[in-house]
Amino acid sequence: MDFNENKLINQTYENNWLIEETYQQSDFHQCHFNNITTQDIVFEHCYFYQTMFNQCDLSNIKFDNCMFRQVQFNNCKLLGSDFSESSFDQVIFNDCLCHFANFSFTRNKETLFNRCDLSQAIFQDTTMNKTKYKECRMIQTSFLHAPLKNIDLSTCLIEAIEAAPQDVNGVIIDEMQSSAFIHLLNIKIKGA
């Protein structure tokens, strides 16, 4: 597949492999990626607009400084995927497996993570303007220097997240989740 054209509009890519390629400054408008598997792929300074990724294995892919606007990732494997320094505007992640995914230094605007496994994912120094997490799994997920103020995590499974006390100031959780945050506040509970 040749993505090195300047602008790809209304293209569909299905049942294919992408191996050992770097794509630079390509624009993807209203494209569909269905059942695509990647290995050693890098997208640098690319723009994805109204694009859908369905049942793709994008594990270990690198999206370097990319812009995603009105994009959906549906039932995708994003194991170890690197989105660092990218921007998300009206992006939806549905039922995605995001173990070890790197969202560091991303700028999120109206981003939804819906039923995603974000275990050991990294959201370091991430801006989360109107970011929502619904029914996500967050085990050892890192939110260092990523303020969670007014972010609702009440429907998520949370265990041993990594964050500074100021990062969790104002986070919205339910009563049962409070024990997952005690260690962040340096509070000790005396056992019975």
Locate each region found by the language model.
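Tandem repeat scaffolds
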Residues: 1-192
